[in-house]
Each structure stands twice: as C-alpha cells, then as structure tokens.
UniProtKB/Swiss-Prot annotation:
One of its GO terms (biological process) is translation. Part of the 30S ribosomal subunit. The lineage of its organism: Archaea, Methanobacteriati, Methanobacteriota, Stenosarchaea group, Methanomicrobia. Keywords: Ribonucleoprotein, Ribosomal protein. Belongs to the eukaryotic ribosomal protein eS8 family. PROSITE patterns: RIBOSOMAL_S8E. One of its GO terms (molecular function) is structural constituent of ribosome. This is Small ribosomal subunit protein eS8. The keyword Isomerase does not apply. Pfam families: Ribosomal_S8e. CDD domains: Ribosomal_S8e (cd11382). It comes from Methanosarcina barkeri (strain Fusaro / DSM 804). It comes from the Archaea. The keyword Secreted does not apply.
Amino acid sequence: MRWQGSSRRKVTGGKVINARGKRKFEMGRESAETRISEIKRKNVHTMGGNRKVRLLQCDVANITNPKDGKTTSAPIETVLDNIANKHYIRRNILTKGSVIRTPLGTAKVTSRPGQDGVVNAVLIE
C-alpha cells in the first residue's frame, strides 16, 4: 500500500511534528501497470461504494484519427516511448502519454488504463 499523506519533512529538511498519525483514507493502492497481452480486467471497490475498472492487460486500443475524427479499434504492437518511466518501454507497460505502435501508425495514449479500464489513443503520425 502507498501512503498519500503529507511528507514528514519540511522543505529545509527538518522533521514535521504531526498532531496526528496516518489515516486509512490517506492510503493508496499499487499501480496497475497495464501490459500488452490478452485482455484482463479487475474490478476495484473505491470510496463511496463506487467501482473502478483496472486494466491489467490489453492488446487492443481505440484509436482516433484527428484529421477525420473517426475512431477505430486496432491491435497494439509495442510501446515506443513512455514519459512516465523509461523502464516501462522495455516492459511494454501502458500509461497515459505513452506512445504505441499500431498497424494504423504511431499513437499517443490519452486514457488512463489503470483507472478507466480502456486504452484510447490519438494518431500522431
């Protein structure tokens, strides 16, 4: 689990003396790290009784051509670039902003696969 509360250190490097401890609502979850493979989803219960769909694996993307505005589904071949983490390129992990190669051309992922449960992308070439 990840803790998403405020830091225990000040900007100067000194310790902050907290008036209280950690709270459960400050906890986060590990990232989904969506890989290129046969589609695999996971439902997660979130705060307020809501649900979030985590996309663990995916091999298809909804690709929009900005010139004509049409969206088509195409298989994902590989990850070419990922600004989130340079090591994600070798591991073929999809995140928002990653550049993927498809039969239609290179595209940039615009959705958040670990949060939305789908891979949407826009052609860049």
